[in-house]
Amino acid sequence: MMSHPDRADMPDTHFYAWDARGHGQSTGARGYSPSLARSVLDVDEFVRFVAKVAQVSLEDIVVIAQSVGAVLVSTWVHDYAPKIRGMVLASPAFKVKLYVPFARMGLKLMQRIRGLFYVNSYVKGKLLSHDPERIESFEQDKLITRAIAVNILLDLYKTAERIVSDSAAITLPTQLLISGDDFVVHVKPQKQFYAGLRSAIKEQHILPGFYHDTLGEKDRALAFDKMKNFIDKLYAAKPYVFDYSHEDQWSPSADAYRELQAPPKARSLEEMFYSSLSYGMKTVGRLSKGMCLGYETGFDSGSTLDYVYRNQPEGNGILGRMIDRHYLNSIGWRGIRIRKINIQQVIEQAVAKLKESDMPIRVIDIAAGHGRYVLDALEKHQDIESILLRDYSDLNVEKGQAMIEERGLGHVAQFKEGNAFDYDSLATIEPAPTLGIVSGLYELFPDNASIKASLAGLAAAIPPGGVLVYTGQPWHPQLKTIAYTLTSHQNDIPWMMRVRSQKEMDTLVEQADFEKCHQVIDEFGIFTVSLAVRKQHG
């Protein structure tokens, strides 16, 4: 499409194209990317680059994407919640048609055995478009890679399933163009994705007779007309703002949270599965040190978190250590360890940002657990004025203070007991912090009132130009397993979580007068780490 921007008939609009044939022209193997998450980050970096070059805000940008690119863009909107004007998706490849039975299962097995290898696409140009010139271009273009790395193909399926099932988290104005005779991707997931979208501004158009290359079809003028009309309407109105004021009460995530509170139906297969799993964890599972610690302090406690960070299997005998290794390798704990790395990197960026602004570096972590990730990130810096770590738990304060002393940081760091949701105690912190950190806390509490009080307290304490590092959990694949088998630090009750979409979390931060400027997310799409700057007063 971007080879013919004039077809959009929008002469007053600047078009920027990202040439991703073969995953771009960077060095390295064609058809390969380290992960689909890295490719999604490419989208984020490209759009922000365009905004900088064009000297416009993200709210002035509409993103158009097709096929795999449409999956990347919809994932970006879901995971990063960018403040763009809207998006147009053409034939998103949410489910590629694999005509060999059990192909996906076989690819997974072969990947485990062989590692990285490439899968060739045998799709012919004549199955993509009716346009002879477009067909010829596809067949002759040497930059179009027929082979795709197996990790990307499998990641595409996995990520697409996540985004389609959780499309209710997307509240951005969206137009979906579906090709009526698509031989490459399935139509059903596209319709499911669209049905879940919660923006009041959305359009779905089915284009009869169109092959997969929607924007490169012979009659593509039909698609371009619909696209132009949609984009014109977006630019003619003010940027659409979704109302998140009751998200913790009336939303799909609130409904899902309430559903968790109802146990599985008695004597159902689901009930028998979770009962058996819970029984096994409470009996044989106690050979694992990690599980024992979870039952003693809560699986969401600072002590458990620190144990997961250390990632050293311990237990009674060989069996205990094997169980502990399996426990530590669960997708949630793997994501937590990636989050630790991401937090440390974002803290580094926060420190650099403060230095650029000639601001003193005074740190507050309002729910630090044992404080390991903060101390790991900051102990090498010599120009930190103060580090104040706080937590509700006496045990965490004791363990954290011991860690401070072990590292010889007692001259600059201290650990105190404190309530992370108490506005007054946060607003009056002395000396006034310039770097606030909230990691893994808000995800544990379903209501937004307490989060608002916490963020307001931090906003009152942090001066304009100061920064906030905060985490989010827009999605989790094990919510039921956690709710029905693990216990919380809160009086040993079941550990139930309400996921907040990234846009909901960012909105809460923005309402507290912080402006998000950077974000990272793990490859599973579970945990985010963001950086925001305290706005000027007034």
Where are these regions (language model features)?
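Conserved alpha/beta-hydrolase
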Residues: 6-28
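Catalytic nucleophile-loop/oxyanion-hole region of alpha/beta-hydrolase
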Residues: 24-54
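Short beta-strand/loop motif that positions the catalytic acidic residue
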Residues: 170, 176-178
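Short alpha-helix in the alpha/beta-hydrolase fold that links the catalytic acid
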Residues: 172, 186-195
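Catalytic active-site module of serine/aspartate enzymes centered on a nucleophile-bearing elbow/loop
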Residues: 208-257
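Conserved SAM-binding loop of SAM-dependent methyltransferases across substrates and taxa
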Residues: 370-383
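A short glycine-rich, Lys/Arg-flanked "PGG" loop and its adjoining helix->strand segment in the class I
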Residues: 452-464
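Conserved beta-strand signature within the Rossmann-like core of class I S-adenosyl-L-methionine
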Residues: 465-472
